[in-house]
Structure formats: C-alpha cells, structure tokens
Amino acid sequence: FPAGVLNMVQGEGDIGARLTTHVDVNCVIFTGSFATGRRIREATFDQPHKKVCLELGGKNPAVVLDDADLDQATREILLGALLTTGQRCTATSRVIATAGIADALKRRLMEALIRIKPSDPFDAHCFIGPLASESARERFFHLLKQAKAEGAEPWIESVPMSGGAFVTPSIYGVSGEEP
C-alpha cells in the first residue's frame, strides 16, 4: 500500500487471522473481546515489527455528570450510539449518569429517540439506516431478548420495519449501582 494509506478491513475471525499473521501488515488495531484480543496478541507476538493496539472488553459508556449540558449530551450519545446504525465496536452502548441528572437525561434521550425514523441511507436526511442484513436483525432482537431476561427494562422497544433490515431504535435501562 502507498505510505500514509489507512485500510480498514472488517470481517470475521478468518479475515482477522490472515491479517494479523501476514508479513506485509505492519499495524493491527482491534476493538472487541478479551478472547479475540488474546488471540491477536499471541498471533503477533513473534512479529516485533508489527504495531498492535488493542481496546478490549469495554462497553463504550457515555458518562454524564451533574454539570453537563444535557442537550449536547443527548446529541452526542445518540450520534455515538446510532452512527452506522450502531454496528461498530465503538458504538456508545451504555450511559452512566449521576443521580442528579439521570431522570432529565433519560427524558431527553427518549424524546429525541422517538423522533428518529430509520430511512434510506442514500437520503440526505437519514440519521439511521438499516442493519447490515436480515441475520444481523435477528441477532439484534435476540440480544434485546437476552437483555430483558437479564433484567434490563425496555424504555423504548425496537420493532422490525418492512423493506429490508430496518428496526426502530430502542433504549433499555438498568437501575442501581451496577450497570
């Protein structure tokens, strides 16, 4: 590749395995699970020329404190969560808010979210498009079902839409000390 070119390759484990072991790949950056990160570290251990950056195990929280501008926090949370329809490892997937502003932030997030309608990604006004595939949509609803089984409370539930892998966005909440 020409100097200064960044290539982003997304895919499953077989693609990652080939990239991490290929001698012409001089840098690997990965965001995801500890298990996969461990495999990447092991695969690149004997390649001292290769730079490796691993961001492992996080759930990409937005932390909102009492002195926050709640309108800006709402915009940034929704952008972080819904950019690329939330289909990236770094998508904001949880919000931690102090007790003093939690209810007001929840209200703002819910009011903003119900106004967001998934649409054609080629539409200039599109904020959220479809999921990548029907199987991604099935997995999405499986994860929501699992979240409810683990105690998450649906504040706004997603519903499937017609015309592709579209779903309405959702917010689930968990109260208490442990997010």
Residue ranges and their predicted role:
Residues T21-H22, C27, F34-E178:
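ALDH superfamily catalytic-core signature
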Residues F1-G16:
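PLP-dependent aminotransferase-like
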Residues Q10-G13, G32, A99:
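Residues that line or immediately flank small-molecule/substrate-binding pockets and catalytic motifs
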